[in-house]
Amino acid sequence: FPGVMGIFGHGNVTSLGHSLEQHRDEIPVYRGQNEQGMGLAAAAFAKATRRRQILICTSSVGPGATNMVTAAGVAMANRLPVLFISGDTFNSRLPDPVLQQVEHFGSPSTSVNDAFRPVVRYWDRITDPAQVLSSLPHLVGMMLDPAECGPAFLGLPQDVAAMAYDYPTEFFTKRVRTVPRSRADEEDLATAAHLIRSSKRPVVIAGGGVHYSLAERVLADVAQRHGLPVVETVAGKSSLLATHPSYSGPLGVTGAAAANAVVTQADLVIAVGTRLQDFTTGSWTLFSSDTQFVSINAARFDALKHGAVAVVGDARETLDELSTLLDDWHTTDEWAAHAATCRIDLDEFVTERIADDGELPLSYAQVVGAVHRAAADDDYVLTAAGGLPGELNINWRSKGIATFDCEYGFSCMGYEISGAWGAAMARPHVQTFALVGDGSYLMMNSDIYASILSGHKFILVVCDNAGFAVIERLQVGQGGNSYNNMLRDSVGPGADVRVDFRAHAASLGAHSIDVSTLDELANALAAARTHDRTSVIVVKVRE
């Protein structure tokens, strides 16, 4: 636990807050501006550290706690470890109802903290100080377990939190915990190897589990050794460099047609560390009806999906052991040639999309291309909901391993800015770039100030198309009328008002600038890298 993100209220300031102040030189506390933003930043931090470090988020009872429920959902959907600690109502119930308490007439032990139950892996309410001796080791073990990883919640009733307790000295002994690497069953490995040897058109789907297993190098070696084309999920993007000969692009709804052309013709899919969500599988329409699946996953729940041959184990170790069984087996020249042709199609497609066509405003793809040119190999790029996930998934050619974060598990608007703060905190020696739409900016922007307050700089590119354009396209494309998505189609006399994002960002302390052309954007990105604090670049884009 390298740090705490906190907003203090009466439910935590006189207990946990007091203790944190006494140990301020040992564990830093970063002041949040919004409890949801804190949680989103902590989730992004966990992803940027590849689940090797965990932040704590603490809030008061009531609205401070419920504000974190959405962030817990993000962490839960993306299998990311975050420890949420909220104040709770009095265990004794003597002062009930306390400030911010929601009363349940027929269930007096229920509080709003019970809302965390569906969105965390581990939930506990500490009703006696001694319970920490049991609860804390269990939740830490869960958050470090690749098969069970996710957020945890502790509720601290205000009277219990204020109690003194003589914890045994050995409870505070320093412990070094290793992330376990489970080994797959030998029979399952043999079955998977047989299926691969028998296949004519195999393809690997690389998911986020590749990153968390630190399996990228092994995946690259195994794919090249056996001639396996590799497509990536959104969470698995940057598992391979875009220049790797086995890289075949991003698949799925937000992916590229060229990559999907490989997947649709595959007779065997080797899914590595992926949940196989609907945007990855096209709601299972991407695959042939007779396609077989081998699923390598630390979590049995995921490995069993879609009737796959489940190989339950650590991705890195399982790929290595599977390659040993395959020995000198290599896929057919015809299949390798098809994948290579699709790869050429993908490169040509992206090159055309990001090129300057002389028209204004710029397209999303052109903005992505400009940021890509400005980024160094080890820089980090981040986005989330709306149209940008598809644009970055297709148009971002990964220059470095594990340098890409698109929150598309919970698809949470607002993750972009808060997440950039957390990622910048996790990777202070590289530049973090975040791309955000105007809708998400308006939904959650206060962590621009949080990043300046804490000194964790990032570069934010705001793509302004005056509304929720991607949902507008879905609305109209499915036969509906344009309504309540674009500003021009919204109800009210202010529908023609455009937000001055540059001025707003400047008011939060950021360097900020408006740009309109690719040259202006390139110059602004170069200047932002030299600035001493967060920079915001605003560009109007096509709908």
Residue ranges of model-derived segments:
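Phosphate/pyrophosphate-binding active-site segments
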Residues: 127-130, 153, 168, 294-385, ...
